[in-house]
Amino acid sequence: MKHLVITGDRNTGTDHDFTGAFEPESVRYAKHWRSKGDAVDVTRVDLSKHDRERVAQMLTAIRTAAPIDRLAIFSHGWQTGIQLGLSSSSSSARDELAAFATALACASTPELRIALYCCSTGGSDVPNGLGSFADRMRLALVAAGRRDVTIFAHRVAGHTTRNAAVRLFGPGMTGGVDLGTTREARQRLDAQLHAGSDPLRWTLPYLPIDEARAAYP
């Protein structure tokens, strides 16, 4: 498998979000998958640039790494976008998201899976995340030819990799499905994601959705 990891390149203001979370977690992700024999490219986006330039940097990295099977993004996020320049908050932003999806589809394999290690990208005003950034990103990729793509996202704000508010978006779905909806499953999911020796935070985004739901109902 070929992975591409994308992060920002600096802390935001006085926060230690990059050096304290996004950078070390992206390094751990790459180390894990390389230990399994996978190829992993890592790129950093210059956050001093405007949104369109950030997206252009991501596209350059995607084309350089092609063909990719796995895309992992470590950054801030919200219900309608991510820190690295992509948004779904307006018609023009959705057009840009569609253009990004087309380029990603051309530079990826049919096995493409995406992990959004970003806050809130799977959340919306609808309980199943319909209309969220992750949902719109998946639909844009489907329109671009990646009909089987799945996207891992978080419903609410939390740690970039240890947030147990997980929502998965996949083929044939309207919106997404939540993991850990029972108390026992949520506690187990939370414990595993917080355990430094447990690889679940790297493997969960790429499990078949039915398998993930069966393990963490």
Which residues make up each language-model segment?
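Catalytic-core segments of thiol-dependent peptidases
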Residues: T7-V126, I209-Y216
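Active-site-proximal C-terminal subdomain of hydrolase catalytic domains
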Residues: R113-P217
